[in-house]
UniProtKB/Swiss-Prot annotation:
The gene is G. The lineage of its organism: Viruses, Riboviria, Orthornavirae, Negarnaviricota, Haploviricotina. It comes from Borna disease virus (strain V). InterPro entries: BDV_G (IPR009344). Glycosated; Stabilizes it. A portion of p57 is cleaved into p27 and p29. p27 and p29 are called gp43 when glycosylated, as they seem to have the same molecular weight. Residues 274-315 are annotated as: Fusion peptide. GO terms for cellular component: host cell endoplasmic reticulum membrane; host cell plasma membrane; membrane; viral envelope. This is Envelope glycoprotein p57.
Length: 503
């Protein structure tokens, strides 16, 4: 009996609904080992109006081209291991991985011991050092472009490759690895055009903006010159109107609320230079999430990056379907599953292999397309939450009255009833991260690197007592075996000489 059409349609709809519920969460998979894109954010174009203050300028610039170039990538690492053997049998080890920047022939694959013995008056320690060097040589393909950064690599950051290194055929990357390739000479064609630009008249210096380049340039005596573009504007002062004087305002009734200050500072909010300073100050120092600002500013949802002096350092990502896992560890970011592997989803929606620590019991509200609430170390997956989508009316008294629905309970006494928080200390719940003292390594993305803190595992009095008793038992057993070996031949000879004892 064949199934009916309505059954098939219903079954297909159910499968689609279940799949949508399963993959309702998405994360960004990003390759930050690749070369980032450097984009001038042009925050000065924030108040740019294409139809006002238009002037004609003569522009001469270099045409941009991109080619692929085969290369050989060489990466060498030196593995350093130093083992300390204590007098009582305990030991400790320091493991360090360093980048080797010498020649491949100089990267020896044999061990090199040093400091065979160290001893002083209170303990005796044997330190043995072993160093092994390994190199990986890979054939790769890179992209060379006529504008900086001149080289793009998907396996490493090639932003530091200069034009001279392109012509020499060898370059050292920022991570210490090297690239060898056929020497290449950059060549660009000069393009001359007459373009319409917009003069920003509310700036202290004359700035012309071109929509064709999405860039603005500061004019000095009507011209701008650089290695890649030359701009000459003849009538750059004729289209600007004189500035209006700001009116004196009554500042005696100003209060600290933002809605009271906003009308007073209306002229300041409209000033592009002040907005530029605010944006660069907030997002250029790492205080706020620069990736969220870059996505809104560049109108691209699948990028991450940071801002350095008005220039966005951006990586392209792609969205993948992930699912929450049980939050059973002391991690600040929630664990997620992607293709059977465990990752951590940070606040910017990016998948990471590492995460900061957090105290157990910390509740976190997160935004991943929807609001989610999860508790660190609870063993429960984060769940979606909803909120009342109404805004308050900007009056402090009514704002407090509308939200006065939480019982007034002492935070310290309330948290002391939680045994986990009490074990960590009642003051620790004020910090999102735990004060960890056992982390002596840092993940840099290319490998596990030890930062060189010494190890004192041999300073263990209980271990000394245990080893001393073990040595005493071992010595007693040896002495018993020696006495037994000495007495057995004598007893055999005595029995042979006297015979067996009889009544």
């Amino acid at each position: 009996m064949q199934p009916s059409m309505s059954f098939l349609i219903g079954f297909g709809t159910l499968v689609l609904v279940l799949s949508a519920r399963t993959f309702d969460l998405q994360g960004l998979s990003c390759n930050t080992d690749s070369t980032p894109g450097l984009i001038d954010l042009e925050i000065r174009r924030l108040c740019h109006t294409p139809t006002e203050n238009v002037i004609s300028c003569e522009v001469s610039y270099l045409n941009h081209t991109t080619i692929s170039l085969p290369a050989v990538h060489t990466s060498c690492l030196k593995y350093h291991c130093k083992t300390y053997w204590g007098f009582f049998g305990s030991y400790s080890a320091d493991r360090i991985i360093n980048r080797y920047t010498g020649t491949v022939k100089g990267c020896l694959n044999n061990s090199a011991p040093e400091d065979p013995f160290e001893c002083n008056w209170f303990y005796c320690c044997s330190a043995i050092t072993t160093e092994i060097c390994r190199c990986s040589i890979t054939n790769v393909t890179v992209a060379v472009q006529t504008f900086p950064p001149f080289m793009y690599c998907s396996f490493a950051d090639c932003s530091t490759v200069s034009q001279q290194e392109l012509e020499s055929g060898k370059a050292m990357l920022s991570d210490g690895s090297t690239l060898t390739y056929t020497p290449y000479i950059l060549q660009s064609e000069v393009v001359n055009k007459t373009l319409n630009g917009t003069i920003l008249c509310n700036s202290s210096s004359k700035i012309v903006s071109f929509d064709e380049f999405r860039r603005s340039y500061s004019l000095t005596n009507g011209s701008y010159q650089s290695s890649s573009i030359n701009v000459t504007c003849a009538n750059y002062t004729s289209s600007c109107r004189p500035r209006l004087k700001r009116r004196r305002r009554d500042t005696q009734q100003i209060e600290y609320l933002v809605h009271k200050l906003r009308p007073t500072l209306k002229d300041a909010w409209e000033d592009c230079e002040i907005l530029q300073s605010l944006l660069l100050g907030v997002f250029g120092t790492g205080i706020a999430s620069a990736s969220q600002f870059l996505r809104s500013w560049l109108n691209h949802p699948d990028i991450i990056g940071y801002i350095v002096n008005g220039v966005g350092v951006v990586w392209q990502c792609h969205r993948v379907n992930v699912t929450f896992m049980a939050w059973n560890e002391s991690t600040y970011y929630p664990p997620v599953d992607y293709n059977g592997r465990k990752y951590f989803l940070n606040d910017e929606g990016r998948l990471q292999t590492n995460t900061p620590e957090a105290r157990p019991g910390l509740k976190r509200v997160m935004w991943f397309g929807r609001y989610f609430l999860g508790t660190v170390g609870s063993g429960v997956k984060p769940r979606r939450i909803r909120y009342n989508k109404t805004s308050h009316d900007y009056h402090l008294e009514e704002f407090e009255a509308s939200l006065n629905m939480t019982p007034q309970t002492s935070i310290a006494s309330g948290h002391e009833t939680d045994p986990i928080n009490h074990a960590y200390g009642t003051q620790a719940d004020l910090l999102p991260y735990t004060r960890s003292s056992n982390i002596t390594s840092t993940d840099t993305g290319s490998g596990w690197v030890h930062i060189g803190l010494p190890s004192f595992a041999f300073l263990n009095p209980l271990g000394w007592l245990r080893d001393l008793l073990a040595w005493a038992a071992w010595l007693g057993g040896v002495l018993y075996l020696i006495s037994l070996c000495v007495s057995l031949p004598a007893s055999f000879a005595r029995r042979r000489r006297l015979g067996r004892w009889q009544e």
